[in-house]
């Protein structure tokens, strides 16, 4: 069955996001097949940094300034430094561009990103960011062009052929994701000790959460990789009676010898005539400890394996054991 190529690979049962602050998110995903931590971590990192859309300033026009190598009376920074500061303005824009923003201010004091007058769907995310500093009696007026895009676009590509004199193109840093790092460690699942644990740290400009950024990056990869799938998945024929809803979790039809338990634990279950997981979970801890040669170590091992499946000892299972249990186990084997 070709489905086993992907269906039998382990998938993470733990995907957790945590944020120390609005712009910094940590993702932990485990367990993954060996090598998949590096594969997924590297792919997600590249897409996060290069392919998510954001908003940025593409050009600025400063009253009285003809080009970026000018200086402005009463302004401490020259125009080149002002342009560098403009590149660092973090913007969220819901609609499509281009849009215009204006700032006008008199000295003395700093001109901040928060002083910019924005239109309806444009928001400045770092209002305390300093654009320039004015001396006593100085005045400045700037008009910004804002647009949406992805990745990095150099100033030359933002220079329109019909641009008016004095319109200075700006390097556009569209990506809402500023930094991404990841590490891969070993993790344990049952008796297997060398699965991968992927930990990623995502820093954004605040226009998007780290969790959403990962979701969008994964969707991009899914869309691109789907083009390489050149077959339709064969549909497994299921007998009509198998469609009937079971009164219990199909995973209970799995045999305990498929749980990859230690030899001692597996032999104890076999000697106690425990064949299916449905048989096992109905046992209490006290009953298990009364099994010959079954100790606390084996008990903890079984509890850990069951917990990974969302199960525990001492559960009640209606209609167990079902009639024709072996036939049911075969019909539902692709669901556990």
UniProtKB/Swiss-Prot annotation:
One of its GO terms (molecular function) is DNA-directed RNA polymerase activity. It is an enzyme of class 2 (transferase). The keyword Transferase applies. One of its GO terms (biological process) is DNA-templated transcription. GO terms for cellular component: cytoplasm; DNA-directed RNA polymerase complex. It comes from the Bacteria. Residues 248-336 are annotated as: Alpha C-terminal domain (alpha-CTD). Residues 1-232 are annotated as: Alpha N-terminal domain (alpha-NTD). It catalyses: RNA(n) + a ribonucleoside 5'-triphosphate = RNA(n+1) + diphosphate. Keywords: DNA-directed RNA polymerase, Nucleotidyltransferase, Transcription, Transferase. Disulfide bonds: none annotated. The keyword Lyase does not apply. Its EC number is 2.7.7.6. InterPro entries: DNA-dir_RNA_pol_insert (IPR011262), DNA-dir_RNA_pol_RpoA/D/Rpb3 (IPR011263), DNA-dir_RpoA (IPR011773), RBP11-like (IPR036603), RNAP_asu_C (IPR011260), RNApol_insert_sf (IPR036643). The N-terminal domain is essential for RNAP assembly and basal transcription, whereas the C-terminal domain is involved in interaction with transcriptional regulators and with upstream promoter elements. DNA-dependent RNA polymerase catalyzes the transcription of DNA into RNA using the four ribonucleoside triphosphates as substrates. HAMAP family: RNApol_bact_RpoA (MF_00059). Homodimer. The RNAP catalytic core consists of 2 alpha, 1 beta, 1 beta' and 1 omega subunit. When a sigma factor is associated with the core the holoenzyme is formed, which can initiate transcription. Belongs to the RNA polymerase alpha chain family. This is DNA-directed RNA polymerase subunit alpha. It comes from Mesorhizobium japonicum (strain LMG 29417 / CECT 9101 / MAFF 303099) (Mesorhizobium loti (strain MAFF 303099)).
